[in-house]
UniProtKB/Swiss-Prot annotation:
Function: One of the essential components for the initiation of protein synthesis. Stabilizes the binding of IF-2 and IF-3 on the 30S subunit to which N-formylmethionyl-tRNA(fMet) subsequently binds. Helps modulate mRNA selection, yielding the 30S pre-initiation complex (PIC). Upon addition of the 50S ribosomal subunit IF-1, IF-2 and IF-3 are released leaving the mature 70S translation initiation complex.
Main subcellular localisation: cytoplasm
Species assigned in the record: Campylobacter hominis (strain ATCC BAA-381 / DSM 21671 / CCUG 45161 / LMG 19568 / NCTC 13146 / CH001A)
Keyword check for Membrane: no
Subunit structure: Component of the 30S ribosomal translation pre-initiation complex which assembles on the 30S ribosome in the order IF-2 and IF-3, IF-1 and N-formylmethionyl-tRNA(fMet); mRNA recruitment can occur at any time during PIC assembly.
S1-like domain boundaries: 1-72
Entry keywords, A to Z: Cytoplasm, Initiation factor, Protein biosynthesis, RNA-binding, rRNA-binding
NCBIfam families according to UniProt: infA
Protein name (Swiss-Prot/TrEMBL): Translation initiation factor IF-1
SUPFAM superfamilies: Nucleic acid-binding proteins (SSF50249)
Length: 72
């Protein structure tokens, strides 16, 4: 899958779950499960409930995503 196929949307982290998984409420009020992208894990970027994040979704599974950026 190429990077052109992903859907990027912003949201707020609601809850931290085990194994670097988070519940994120998107701007359109949907709640999805997200995991942290590898580069964020590599650079030890911490994500806490209440943080504003950018999420990538694939067209195949719109209920799971990947957190790619944490806004400051």
């Amino acid at each position: 899958m190429s990077k052109d196929d992903v859907i990027e949307i912003d949201g707020n982290v609601i809850e931290a779950l085990p194994n670097a998984t988070f519940k994120v409420e998107l701007d359109n009020k949907h709640v999805i499960l997200c995991h942290i992208a590898g580069k964020m894990r590599m650079h030890y970027i911490k994500i806490m409930p209440g943080d504003r994040v950018k999420v990538e979704l694939t067209p195949y599974s719109l209920d799971k995503g990947r957190i790619t950026y944490r806004y400051k």
